[in-house]
Structures are given as C-alpha cells and as structure tokens.
Amino acid sequence: MWRLKVSEGGSPWLRSVNNLLGRQVWEFDPDLGTPEERADVEKARREFAEHRFERKHSSDLLMRMQFAKENCQKLDLLAVKRGEHEDVMGEAVWSSLKRAISRVCNLQAHDGHWPGDYAGLMFFLPGLIITLHVSGVLNTVLSSEHQKEMRRYIYNHQNEDGGWGLHIEGHSTMLGSSLNYVALRLLGEGPNGGDGCIENGRNWILDHGGATFTTSWGKFWLSVLGVFDWSGNNPVPPELLLLPYQLPFHPGRMSSYIRMVFIPMSYIYGKRFVGPVTPVVLELRSELYNDPYDEIDWNKARTQCAKEDMYYPRSSKLDMFWSFLHKFIEPVLLRWPGRKLREKALATSMRNVHYEDECTRYICFGGVPKALNILACWIEDPSSEAFKCHIARVYDYLWIAEDGMKMQIYDGSQVWDAGLTVEALVATDLVKELGPTLKRAHSFLKNSQLLDNCPRDFNRWYRHISKGGWTFTTADDGWQVSDCTATALKACLLLSRISPEIVGEPLEIDAQYDAVNCLMSLMNDNGGFSAFELVRSNTWLEHINPTEAFGRVMIEYPYVECTSSSIQCLALFKKLHPGHRKEEVENCISKGANFIESSQRSDGSWYGSWGICFTYATWFAVTGLVSAGRTLGNSATVRKACDFLLSKQLPSGGWGESYLSCHDEVYTNLKGNRPHGTHTAWAMIALIDAGQAERDPVPLHRAAKALLNLQLEDGEFPQQEIVGVFLQTAMISYSQYRNIFPIMALTGYRRRVLLAGNI
C-alpha cells in the first residue's frame, strides 16, 4: 500500500531552509495494510474507473483512508450546543458545521498543514516521463509501482473519444493526446495495450492530422524524445537573455512563469538535444503520423496546430516573424562565428537555471519548469550534483489518489490551504475546542515564512524581494506570492487575537512588518497587486504569445484576487497596528479598492484569473471592497456585484459555474444547472459580507439549504467539478476547497443571518 509521509526526507541531496516542513511524499510499502484496508483501496479504484466519464475528479480517498487510521482521535463537538435563539434551521446549520469541522481537523497533517491533490493538468506528467526516459533514470527514479499508478492515471483520464485533454475535464487535444500516448508507451505499454485504449488514442491522433498538429510545447517534448525533428519547431533563442533589459521583450520583463519555462527550454533548444533513439522511439515515429517519418515536411509542421488546441491563434505577421528567425537567424547562430554567440547565450541560460535551482532548493517554479530544469542540468553534466539534487525533489510533485499517480502543478498548496483553513476555523465559535488544530497550523505558518531575499544580487536574476513573504507551497520553494503572503499573514493576525495558551505565541512583530513590506512592494501604480512580481512590460507582448494553448501568459498582470487578499490583510493589520506606516498602508488599501472598482465588468462581475471564474473573482472583489469600507448601502459597485450574483442563483438555491467561463469569458452554468458546493459558498460569503441579509435574506436561506443538502454523511462536502485555473485554459484541482469554503459560508450565515435575527 501507499503511505503519505509529511515533512520527512532522508536523501543527502535534499536541500531545505526549515527541515523540509510541509514536504509531502508518497512511498510504497508492500507490507503495509490489512487485507480489509487493501480491499477498500481496490474498491475505491474500481469505483472511480467505472464512473470516470461522469466523475472526472478523485475524492483523494487514499489519503483520507490513511488519516482516518492515523488521526483516529475524534474531535467531539456534539456537546457544543446551538445558540439560545436558534430555530430548527439554526440547529441544522450548527450540526452541519460541527460535522464538517470535525472532519477537517482529522484531515490535518501532524506538521500543521492540510495535504491534498493539487493536479488536474494532463501535460505535466508526460514531460517528466520524457525527461527521466532520455536521461536514462526512468526505472531508477520510478519504481514499478510508481509506473503502474501513472499508467492507471493516464488511462482513467482518457476521454471517451480516445484522446486526452489539456486537463482532466477538457475536450481532447493534440497536446494532451500525443504526450499521454507517448507517456504510456515509455511506461511499458505496447502499441496494442490497455484493452484497446492505446489503439483508441493512436486513432484519435491520426484522425486529427497526426502529431505534427500538436502545440509548440508538444513539439518541443516530442523533439527531445526524438520523435519530432527540431526543424519543425519555432525558434526558442537563448540569445534573448543577452539583449538589453530595457527592451520590453527581454525575458526578465516577461511573466515569471513564462520566463522560468523559456530559460531552460531555450537551453535545450539551443543544444538541439535529442535523447537516445531506442526501439520504442523508432516505433513511435511510425505510430504518431499519417506520413512516413522521413517524408514529413517539418517546415510546414512548424506552423501546424489542431483547432482543438488553438486558444490563442497566431497572426500571419507572427508566423512571418518565426519564419524569419527559423530560416535566416538560426542558421547563422549554428555556425561559426555566430556559434560563439550561441555558446555565450547557452552559458547565460544555465547560470539562470542554477540560480533558480538554488533559490527553490531544486523544487522549481512548477511542474513544467521542474522537468525542464532537470533535463537542462543533465544535458550540461549527467553526473552533476545539480542533477542529483533535482532527482531527490521529483517525488515532491507526485500525488496518488484512487485515480492513480499524477504530477501536481506545484509541490502542493500547503501555505495557501493552511491560511484559508485557519480563517475558516477562527470564524467559528469553537476556538477553544479547536485549539490543538489551530496551534499546529499557526506553527506551520510561522515557520513557513521566508526569512531572506534570494541570495546575492537577486535583481540581476530578475527576482523580486521575498523577505517576509510566504509562498504558495513551502518555504523551500522560495517564490513569494502576494495573495499567499496576505492570506498567511491574515491568518497569523487573526490568531494573534486569541490567547497564546490556546493557539501559541503570535508571529513576531518584526516578521509581521517584513510581511507587510513584501506585500506592499507588489502593488503596481494602478493600485492592482500582481502575484509574483510587478508588471514589467506591455500587454502588446501577448501578440507574440508562442504557446497557442494559453492566454494572458507573456507578462505579469495585476489581479483582482491578489488585490482583494492584500487589502483585506492590510485592513486587519491597520486595525491591530494603526501606527505602522500608516499613510502607506492606507494608500495601498485605497488604491487597491479603486483598482477593483475600475476592473468591474458591465454586468457587475469580475473575471477570475486563479479560480472559476466570475463567481470566484466577484467573491474576492466584494470581500475586498467591504474591507475597504464599501457595502451594499454606500457602493453602487457592490450593489451591482450582488445583483450579478443573485442573477446567477440556480432554482436549487446554489451556484455552479463551468470552467468554460474561463475559456470563453462568458458566465456558463455547469451541465444540467447543477449546484456546486464551492461556488455556492463563494457567492454566499460575498453576499453576506456585502449586507444582503439586511436587504433580503431569502436568497441566503435558499443557498444555505443547498449547501446542507450537498453535505455527505461523514461531514465532508463532495468533490465536484474543477475550481482552479491559470493562464485562462489550464484548469487545476484544489481538493481542500470542498470543505474550507462551505464552512466559511455556513459560519457567516449562522452568525450574521440567523443569530443576527435576519430571518
């Protein structure tokens, strides 16, 4: 059986700033588990497979089974009685809350965070598998059990038409289909394996033109493997790093994510690296294309992309630009004396790769940069310490559930989920009863704060200040994020108002000041807060977006969600520490609120960049505006937002928004107008905070009943459709949201509607 290990690690190649706090790694133990426990696991796997086309998400049952056994001491909240003036509805809500809270407390890891599935994208795992294959360590790094579970995952998320999507809920794409087909073959499946699934996948690829129609990222990975010619790729010139930083298209001015992808990708492209041509590679050359491999027109393939993949079409001018680079510039750089410039650029790329690895303790900036950096380090020196350190951190990205083993978007969502969960629990009337849970979470957050900036001259490497901030995952990751810093600091501030005997000593005041400094440094001139860095270039750079499959990818943007989180935190900080940088804090809150107001769409909504979609962003926008003093009573913006949310309430009383809203930028209900627990909670929280209970509480009563009807017997809320997103099309699972936000919503409903007498 598989077992999740938390905050552990025995490899001499692991690097850490805080003893691996928050690290989560699954290990297989053939002797673990009773026959009954093993049977339960197999039952969960079987049931997922049987319903995989209608229920795309796992419920993270393997972790839940483990924690049910390890955290067997139940939190007894049954004795906590309802309020004196609560009616039958109040009793139902109070009972629901106690059950949900008990369940959440039992899902906490011993180090204080809440582990969970943070995956969803179908093109991450194949990139890792290709990297491990070409570097010759696939069977060393991944045991037979790892590989079996990876095959299970890929098969479970194959669509009925035979293809694979960009994400687990998406329609089949050439990127998802070609890469996952290749991954299965590299994991040992034959061309006719998987009870016909391999053949179905191959047929989908061939019926849609063959793998030449994959996106640029797909072409790149296939070229690395040796089943696509490098001449069929648009250039990824490392020489861009040698250009003056003042130029708006310098990589240092791009978004942090695209920069961390571009740099190692440009090194690998510049080297024209191709892995060993093995028998399976030769077979794939004949399986992926309708034409013989030696007869493919690679120059034509360079601009081909399947319509199923094309989200951000390239203009004819951009194609002409790529053709100019490909036909005239690249040949010069591949021959002397231009080769000298290429070598200088490659060396610069690798210095950037090594700096990023040092700053992130070889975790890197997500799953795609992780695989790319591993490969770049191996190409430079297969025996290097860097490569060994990278391999030790591969396991941080792997997560297993009843649907199989997947590669997460990052090495988890530890800090983000812990901060949100603390906020949800502190709002209840159960602080004393929840003391041990809150104390562990408090300790985790305090010890996950970034204590220093990146080493040496971090500006030279295009990094922003990080001292005082928090990451999305663990301190070892090293990438400060505005909303994660705000959420973690807000949680610590809320806990500082509770007796230290219950929740532990508060975060030191200097650490709070450092956090505020880091947070305020991420506000742009227009009042909006970016996620990782300030905006450094212009939106016109999106016109040279080379990815085809993603939007809003080229530069950093100010985000409504990040701005809201930041001003909520600063408003609470100002209340607790009114004398610290008073004018600056007030200016940030005021400008942030103005940015949110200016970003509202004509229908009263906001577009979500990090969650699905209009419900998510509108919840954030409203709560941010309320923290800045706006309400239904004094703000036309808030009234318009509430009217928008109410217009989307379903007959069931809930809300349910499809990921298609992100893709199409038009609000779209879930199929069948089904209510979604997390979306319902987001809408409820926004309406309650805005003052809807005083205007008309009926929609809130209906929403609360919808949530109660969704709750499961064990106290949890169900895992439903996908709720996270980035780059407009990349959908992400947040498995803890299913409980965090219903608890927040029902707590607010109980306190501000029922107990306040708004019946």
Curated annotation (Swiss-Prot):
Name listed for the protein in its UniProt record: Parkeol synthase
Principal cellular location given in the protein's record: membrane
Gene Ontology terms: biological process: triterpenoid biosynthetic process
Catalyzed chemical reaction(s): (S)-2,3-epoxysqualene = parkeol
Source superkingdom: Eukaryota
Localization per Swiss-Prot or TrEMBL: Membrane
Entry-linked InterPro entries: SQ_cyclase_C, SQ_cyclase_N, Squalene_cyclase, Terpene_synthase_CS, Terpenoid_cyclase/PrenylTrfase
Record's GO cellular component terms: lipid droplet; membrane
Chain segments annotated as transmembrane: 118-138
SUPFAM superfamilies: Terpenoid cyclases/Protein prenyltransferases
Topology of the protein relative to the lipid bilayer: Single-pass membrane protein
Catalytic residues of the enzyme: 483
EC number: 5.4.99.47
Molecular function (Gene Ontology), one example: intramolecular transferase activity
Role of this protein: Specifically mediates the conversion of oxidosqualene ((3S)-2,3-epoxy-2,3-dihydrosqualene) to parkeol.
Swiss-Prot/TrEMBL keywords: Isomerase, Membrane, Repeat, Transmembrane, Transmembrane helix
Stretches forming PFTB repeats: 147-188, 512-557, 589-629, 638-689
